[in-house]
Structure formats: C-alpha cells, structure tokens
C-alpha cells in the first residue's frame, strides 16, 4: 500500500520512520501510547498504521486499561547542570554511538543548548553546510538510529511455513487467528 511507503520515507527521502502495525483494536490502543514514547526517545516520527478492517468494523474487545503508573522515556535530554559541564553543545553529536543525539528543552539554560537548524544540511553543531562528507556522516548516524530503533519497537509476529515462495503479505485481522 502506498501509505506504508509514504509513511516510512515521509521526508526528502534521506530518512526512515518507525512504523507500528497493530493487529487488533487492543494493539491500536497500546501502540498509540508506545508510539509517543518511541518518538520521544528516538526523536523521530512514529506512525501507527491501521488497516481498514480495524478502523471500519465493529470489534468486541476487552476494556482498554490505562496504566497511570507508566513512566515514559523522554530520551536523551540535557538539563542546565549537564550543559554547564560541556564546553560546546552539539545538537547532532552522537556521543553514545547509537545514532540518537542529546537534546535540550527550550529555556533550559540561559546560554547553552539553544540551536537553529534546517533539514539534514547541517553539521553536528546544527550549523548549515552543504559539505558532502558531513552529509554522509549525518546519513550514517540516521542509519545507526534506525538500527537502534529496531531493538526498541515491539517484536514482529513472523510465521514461516514449509512452503516456498516470494510473497510478502501484510493483512489483518490477527495473524495469530488465521488458519492459513
């Protein structure tokens, strides 16, 4: 489906986005909350891709339970004390080598942590550049981030049969309930 590709590469084509595919209304509920958590931690859009069956048909489900004790992972956020310890704040510095950079909230520090940037044409310090080597470093970092994301998203349901073929099928309702 076009919406899957468009969601996965929604930008200039130089980044990927996280896609979650719920199998039923319960997972829609759970994945919607998890999408916000992942978006904060990974600093990238996360799309919950629901199909027509889930969205248009009536379903009998258990009552959705919200966990008021759930704590969200806001990701790598520097506070004023962290910034005071740094010589320079680099918005796109990959200090931990996982593709995810540290960020700040507006107003965190009177002198450090603010930045202005545009697109992917920037260096580690959010300064504009069209240098090809720096752009390659940025894209390499984004690939690392996507690999890190693969360790954080819900595990896929993979059903391999003895049949040979070359067809990938995405569908619902639940693949766990399918006889095929």
Each model region followed by its residue ranges:
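N-terminal low-complexity segments that are often proline-rich with Ser/Thr-Pro
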Residues: 1, 177-180
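Residue positions that mark polypeptide boundaries
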Residues: 3-4, 171
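Flexible glycine/proline-rich, aromatic-decorated loop/lid segments
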Residues: 5-14
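Short beta-alpha connecting loops at secondary-structure transitions
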Residues: 14-21
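Short beta->alpha junction loops/turns
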Residues: 24-25, 172
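Flexible, low-complexity linker and terminal segments
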Residues: 31-172, 176-178
């Amino acid at each position: 489906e076009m919406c899957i590709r468009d969601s996965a590469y929604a930008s200039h084509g130089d980044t990927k986005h996280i896609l979650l595919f719920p199998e039923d209304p319960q997972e829609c509920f759970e994945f919607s909350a998890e999408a916000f958590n992942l978006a904060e931690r990974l600093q990238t859009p996360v799309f919950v891709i629901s199909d027509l069956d889930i969205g248009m048909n009536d379903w009998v489900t258990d009552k959705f339970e919200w966990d008021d004790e759930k704590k969200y992972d806001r990701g790598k956020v520097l506070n004023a004390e962290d910034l005071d310890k740094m010589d320079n704040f680099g918005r796109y510095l990959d200090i931990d080598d996982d593709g995810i950079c540290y960020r700040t909230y507006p107003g965190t520090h009177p002198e450090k942590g603010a930045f202005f940037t545009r697109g992917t044409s920037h260096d580690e310090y959010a300064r504009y550049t069209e240098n090809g080597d720096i752009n390659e470093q940025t894209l390499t970092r984004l690939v690392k981030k996507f690999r890190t994301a693969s360790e954080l998203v819900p595990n896929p349901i993979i059903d391999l049969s003895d049949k040979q073929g070359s067809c990938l099928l995405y569908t619902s309702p639940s693949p766990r309930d399918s006889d095929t």
